[in-house]
Each structure stands twice: as structure tokens, then as C-alpha cells.
Amino acid sequence: MQRPHPILSPDRIAPSIPCSRPDASTLEATALIDGEVDMAYALITGASSGIGRELASLFAANGYDIVITARNQERLNTVQTALKQQYQVRVVVFAADLSEPDAPQRLHDFTTSHGISIEYLVNNAGFADWTGYLDADWSRQQKMMRLNMEALAELTYRYGRDMRRAGHGRILNISSVASMMAGPYMAVYFASKAFVRSLSEAVAYELRDTGVTVTCVCPGPTTTGFAKAANMHGRNFFTMTRPVSARQLAAYAYRRMMRGTTLAYHGPLTRAGALAERLLPRAATRRLAAFMNGGEPNTRSVSATPQAHPERSAQD
């Protein structure tokens, strides 16, 4: 039996909890269960900070037991403790790097083997990289594709099949305003978010009569650790717009998911991007994206050598 879906205002969401970054050993997949597991859960990826952290708070505030996953074990443990104390819900931690090829399968195997039925799936984990395509660190670009596209697609596939079998369930995929156009100097990221939007719309249609919904939310600039991790801090995309808080975006995405909306654009920039996608020539939107990404359209190369980037993303 499905529970009701009360929707709390953003000011009812628990604040994010800062936590220092642990060493790389915490990236190994581990799982901690407190108490027996016998109810339907919400699964949120990239739940240790930012939008994912706020979505985890929303589900907990509305009485849902949750599974939270990210790479950073210490941060996940902090979130687990805070949500259990504040909302008296079960919080299961599964620490793993979802860009590893077998990680989505291991996550699904874990929940299945422990009798955890995932009624709500939130694919939030992802990251970006600001650099010229040919100047990028290829291993980082490959990691981005695996996390932003492959992990999301596999989790949607595996848990979507479970939901279809059960006759109910909701999937929320976080895309971006970047999904609407080609993005010079962030080519792989923009392409990955277009993949998320296209996949979400197609699967939503296929599942239209099954009791399972797929919602794709396309946010604009949001105040998380995303820009710093992507080496974008101070670029036009953030300086010429007014970013919303992770809490505001999470509340919007939660409402849209619960309503079963297929495609949702959050904020004026994203709605303007959707309009530009329909009305402007592709050449114009490419130049616009290049400018908003902080590079000039006629610049041949952003940097002579790949830049070092912090290994931090929405999946931390």
C-alpha cells in the first residue's frame, strides 16, 4: 500500500550539515543497516550534500524510510545520524562510486538481498568539467559519462523493472538547462544531460499505463559544490544569473515527482533555454552556450594542458 504524499515547504527541510572530506579509503562500497528492513524506501544518489542531501531530508520529513548513496562514507554517516534523529525514519547508507562499472548492479543487489523495496528512485549524482574537449583529461570525461549517463540509465532500468512488476513507483532524474543545446567548453556534460532528458521522456511514455512515472527536472544555476568541482566558479553562467538554493530546487523537484510530471523546467533561465531551443537556430544556441560557459565562441582552445580538478561532485 502506498503512503500519502504530503509536501512540505522548503523552510521545513533540515539544513545541510558540513563535514570534512575523508581519505580515499572511504570510497569502497559499504552498507550500514540499522534495524530490520521491511518497508518501501526512497533511494537517493549523490545524497551526501547539495540537492541530493535536501531531497533526502524532504523524503525523511514526509515520513519515508530512505537509502542514501554517495562516495563519501563519513558524510553519509553524518546525514544518516541527522535524519534519523530529526525525523525518526530508517536511513540505510550504501557508500560507493557509481561511476565504477559494477556499482549500480551492486547497489541493486544490496537492496534486493536485504528486502528493501525501492518505491522512489532519485538519480541525482553527477558532475561537470569546464575545459576544451581536446584539452580535457580523458579519464575524467569517461568517468563523467559513466556517472551522468550509464549509472543513471542502469539504475532506472533495474529499479524501473521492479516498480513495473509491483505496479507502482516514481523515478526522478535530475537533468539540467544544459540538456537543451550543445555546450562548447563543457561538451560532454551538456551531451550527458541531453541524454538524461531524452531517456527520461522516452521511458516515461513506455511506462505510462503501468503505475510508474518518470520525472525529469531541468534546473538552472544552483548553489551547491557543483560549480567549484567543475572549475566554473566565477564563470558567466553563475555571475550573470541568480542561482537558487539547493533547498528550493529540491522542494520543486519533489513536488514534480509526486505529481508525476514528465518534464519540468525550474527557474527563468531554464524556461528561457527551452524557448531558445524551439525558436533559435542551433548555431545561435551554441554561441550562447559558449558565452555562458565563460569561453568565447571563436576561441580555439581553452587551455594548453588539462587542468587538475578536485575529485568532488554531486555523488560525494
Annotate each language-model stretch with its function:
Residues N124-D129:
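Conserved NAD(P)H cofactor-binding loop of Rossmann-fold oxidoreductase domains
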